[in-house]
A protein has these predicted regions:
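Topological signature of polytopic alpha-helical transporters
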Residues: 1-66, 71-73, 80, 103-108, ...
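Conserved catalytic motifs of ABC-family nucleotide-binding domains
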Residues: 83, 114-116, 128-139
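Helix-to-loop junction immediately C-terminal to a conserved catalytic motif
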Residues: 92-96
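ABC ATPase C-loop
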Residues: 199-200
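Catalytic Walker B motif of ABC-type/P-loop ATPase nucleotide-binding domains
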Residues: 207-211, 216
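Alpha-helical transmembrane segments and their short interhelical loops
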Residues: 226, 234, 240-241, 246-250, ...
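Hydrophobic alpha-helical transmembrane segments of multi-pass membrane transport proteins
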Residues: 411-479, 531
Length: 650
């Protein structure tokens, strides 16, 4: 991290002046930020402390931040954690959640942006890379290009992707799988370059990057910043936040901004930074990294009250010196000069040649299918997990019998109960395992304006339907015929249809919860609890409670009509074909007093006692059950609409 600064500063001075001269000669684009302030209201205490939780205090995140940057320049925003770097990027790009607490102006080419124009002007690369693990680099960029550009020829898309990969030195690893923590793929630096390449496909003139070097080794971090510097010098504006840059990067930045507690402590070229702090009485030692030295100098030490007050006063003195300096006056003059141009240049929007909603849905479906198709173990588990459960049931049950004394009724009812209760849970496991990565990438790409979140949800639903049909078909075929259920094709068809809908409903219900709850583990636990409650209400257990609990039963039994398991359990008589079964006679000389099981000699008696309306309402229950599918699909789409609002306010 350390090294002599003098030679570096000489190169920096030369490079910085060259960049400024070039930008001043013919500035095609510019960004001007004037007096940006941002506050949030936070609760004082935790939720369990009611008196403190109800109280709020106002926290200043940004305070009167101003700067100006022109095309051909790269600006690095420095500062410790909590200094306001990321919030500043969010404010520039229009991604702030609580917009009512935002004050100030953002100008592009002297024009103040409208609310809906921010997304179409700035390309934003977040700190974490959201990429699909099983795609190659070329596939990932190709699908992004298809979502970005209106329907073009394959030749055009390929040339576009190849050009971007060449620009970011990705061509030699184009066919390499991206990978994840579970299996090896590309390196961290290569992942970051893929994220940048995805943004370049939209031909942006302004690029914002949040901590692009985080988690990378020194060499890779240097390469990323060098690459961004080259991109900036190709007539782009590049603004990055950076936490601990090496001294070798000093010469690459055309402008450097230092943030502390939401205030701009300094903004200017590298040589101006050295001169400014030296004039303030804080010369950088020769063997020190100037970045580290000045960031530490402008940070507030909170280890003790005395140190906090002392360092805060020092920061305020430096801020005051900067606000009264020629450097700051020059920044404000550049902002006013840009606004006062008679013929303002147009706003440099990204490529807005977007395809139709249906075509985007088709591309998302193709990308999702291609990504999951390479996960061989995942495909096998999705197809066979229901069958594995079937093996477990068959092992204990083997064949259905007709002997009441050996549990004929319990076996039939229990088999059907297990067959229709387990598939919703396997559907939940599928959604919890597969959808969170798609949700993460849709959160990012929907912010970039590539598509809406509901389109990703719908693409996933269309994707998993064939897998659900095949998985349930394998399970149904095995368990129905191996258990010796009623040998009739129509009965098997009903059995398959009921199990299929229960499996799909389980996955759809999980999608609904994934829309509003971030943690997949909480979602899984929540769906399991809902299914458990559905078993209690839907199976008719409440209707058989003791008379002392009749009041509770009456209150909760109303909810059974909103629970899909209530309608599924109504098919137990039909699936078990009880009315066609004549149970084996009891032993001679036995009586119902000795053995109550002898009260049942025909299956119809079991139906009349436990499911009195099941047969007469068969068609109605079947239609209502399948009506849950479009209903839950619509609710899932609405839940991700809610998610869009929640994320927008974070």
């Amino acid at each position: 991290m350390s090294g002599r600064v003098s030679p570096t500063l000489e190169r920096s001075s030369s490079d910085g002046q060259t960049g400024e001269t070039k930008a001043t000669a013919q500035p095609s684009d510019s960004i001007s930020v004037r007096d940006i302030s941002y506050t949030v209201r936070e609760r004082i205490g935790p939720w369990w402390n009611v008196s403190l939780y109800r109280k709020k205090w106002t926290k200043q995140i940004l305070k009167d931040v101003s700067f100006h940057i022109e095309s051909g320049q790269i600006m690095g925003i420095l500062g410790n954690s909590g200094s306001g770097k990321t919030t500043l990027l969010d404010s520039i790009s229009g991604r702030l959640g609580y917009k009512d607490n935002f004050f100030g102006e953002v100008y592009v080419n002297g024009r103040q942006l409208k609310k809906e124009q921010f997304r179409d002007c700035f390309s934003y690369v977040p700190q974490s890379d959201t990429l699909l693990s099983f795609l190659t680099i070329q596939e990932s960029l190709t699908y992004t290009a298809l979502l970005t550009l209106q329907k073009r020829s394959n030749d055009f898309i390929k040339k576009k992707v190849d050009a971007v990969m060449a620009e970011l030195s990705l061509s030699h690893i184009a066919d390499k799988i991206i990978g994840s923590r579970i299996f090896v793929g590309i390196s961290g630096g290569e992942r970051r370059r893929v994220s940048i390449a995805a943004q370049l496909l939209q031909d942006p003139k302004v690029m914002l990057l949040d901590e692009p070097t985080t988690g990378l080794d020194c060499l890779t971090a240097n390469q990323i910043v060098s690459l961004l510097s080259e991109l900036a010098h190709r007539d782009r504006i590049v603004i990055i936040t950076i936490h601990q840059p090496r001294s070798e990067l000093f010469r690459l930045f055309d402008k450097i901004a230092i943030m502390s507690f939401g205030e701009m402590v300094f903004c200017g070229n590298p040589m101006e930074m050295i001169t400014f702090f030296s004039d303030c009485g804080y010369s950088c030692p020769e063997q020190s990294n100037p970045f580290d030295f000045y960031v530490d100098l402008t940070s507030v030490d909170t280890r003790s009250k005395e140190r906090e007050l002392e360092t805060y006063r020092r920061v305020q003195v430096i801020v005051s010196a900067y606000k009264n300096s020629e450097i700051f006056i020059k920044e404000l003059a550049a902002i006013e000069r840009t606004k006062s141009v008679k013929e303002l240049p147009p706003i440099p929007f990204k490529n807005k040649d977007s395809p139709s909603a249906f075509y985007k849905l088709w591309i998302l479906l193709r990308r999702t299918t291609r990504n999951f198709s390479r996960d061989k173990i995942g495909i096998i588990m999705r197809l066979l997990q229901n069958l594995l459960f079937g093996f477990f049931v068959a092992f204990f049950l083997l064949r259905l019998r007709t002997d009441l004394l050996k549990g004929a009724v319990q076996d039939r009812a229990g088999l059907i109960y297990q067959c229709i209760s387990a598939p919703p849970l396997t559907g939940t496991l599928n959604a919890v395992a597969l959808y969170p990565p798609l949700r993460a990438i849709s959160d990012q790409e929907s912010k970039d304006g590539l598509y809406k979140k509901w389109q990703m949800v719908l693409a996933y639903i269309v994707h998993f339907l064939p897998f659900s049909v095949i998985s349930v078909a394998i399970f149904s075929t095995f368990i129905y015929w191996s258990a010796g259920m009623y040998p009739e094709a129509s009965r098997f068809g009903i059995f398959f249809a009921v199990i299929l809908v229960s499996h799909i409903i389980g996955e759809l219900l999980t999608l609904v919860m994934l829309g509003v709850i971030q943690n997949p583990n909480i979602v899984q636990s929540g769906v399991v609890l809902l299914n458990s409650a559905g078993v209690i209400v839907g199976s008719g257990l409440l209707s058989k409670l003791d008379k002392s609990l009749t009041l509770i039963s009456n209150h909760f039994s109303f909810f059974q009509f909103f629970i899909f398991l209530f309608f599924i359990y109504s098919f137990i008589p039909s699936l078990g074909r009880f009315w066609k079964v004549n149970f084996a006679a009891c032993e001679p000389n036995s009586s119902t007093a000795i053995n109550p099981a002898c009260m049942l000699s025909h299956g119809i008696q079991f139906i009349e006692e436990n499911f009195p309306d099941a047969l007469s309402q068969f068609t109605t229950n079947f239609l209502i059950l399948y009506a849950f599918l479009p209903g839950l699909t619509i609710i899932a789409i609405l839940s991700f609409k809610i998610r869009e609002r929640i994320i927008g306010r974070q």
